[in-house]
């Protein structure tokens, strides 16, 4: 009995069913639409951060509804509130525990520039210890501002090269 190999031959009927894309575009689409933010609620901005999860603002539209409180399960840190020099090493350590790629949003005037606190104990912006991707102004910022910052971060992620940080040499 002779078997035919017709199953392995090319068929022109499947041409319309295949989607061809660059791997970067696919990976960035996944990263954009499934962000896992970790809130660092250090002061009163954390109360406004809670508001984006309710039905009126609905952060789930942007794929970021699941807040993770473990740095190993998150890829976006939202620093909400004033950063003191005493808290800075812990924030940096938590940031270092996050898997790559990772992004940071500085939420509010205190996290962005120190806010109204100009003292020996308060750091003048979290960007002195972390690379900040998006800043949100306001004291405290409105939930619409948080959603706008999330959309700006998603636009930034879409333009990144997804494969450049996959294989880093460890020193």
UniProtKB/Swiss-Prot annotation:
Catalytic activity, EC: 7.1.1.-
Cofactor: [4Fe-4S] cluster
Record's function text: NDH-1 shuttles electrons from NADH, via FMN and iron-sulfur (Fe-S) centers, to quinones in the respiratory chain. The immediate electron acceptor for the enzyme in this species is believed to be ubiquinone. Couples the redox reaction to proton translocation (for every two electrons transferred, four hydrogen ions are translocated across the cytoplasmic membrane), and thus conserves the redox energy in a proton gradient.
Lineage top rank: taxon: Bacteria
Membrane topology: Peripheral membrane protein
InterPro entries in the cross-refs: NADH_UbQ_OxRdtase-like_20kDa, NADH_UQ_OxRdtase_20Kd_su
Cofactor comment text: Binds 1 [4Fe-4S] cluster.
Family: Belongs to the complex I 20 kDa subunit family.
Quaternary state and interactors: NDH-1 is composed of 14 different subunits. Subunits NuoB, C, D, E, F, and G constitute the peripheral sector of the complex.
GO molecular function, one term: NADH dehydrogenase (ubiquinone) activity
Pfam families on file: Oxidored_q6
A single Gene Ontology CC term: respiratory chain complex I
SUPFAM superfamilies named in the record: HydA/Nqo6-like (SSF56770)
Positions of [4Fe-4S] cluster binding: 44-45, 110, 139
Location relative to the cell: Cell inner membrane
Catalyzed reaction equations: a quinone + NADH + 5 H(+)(in) = a quinol + NAD(+) + 4 H(+)(out)
Name of this protein: NADH-quinone oxidoreductase subunit B 1
Gene3D superfamilies, per the entry: 3.40.50.12280
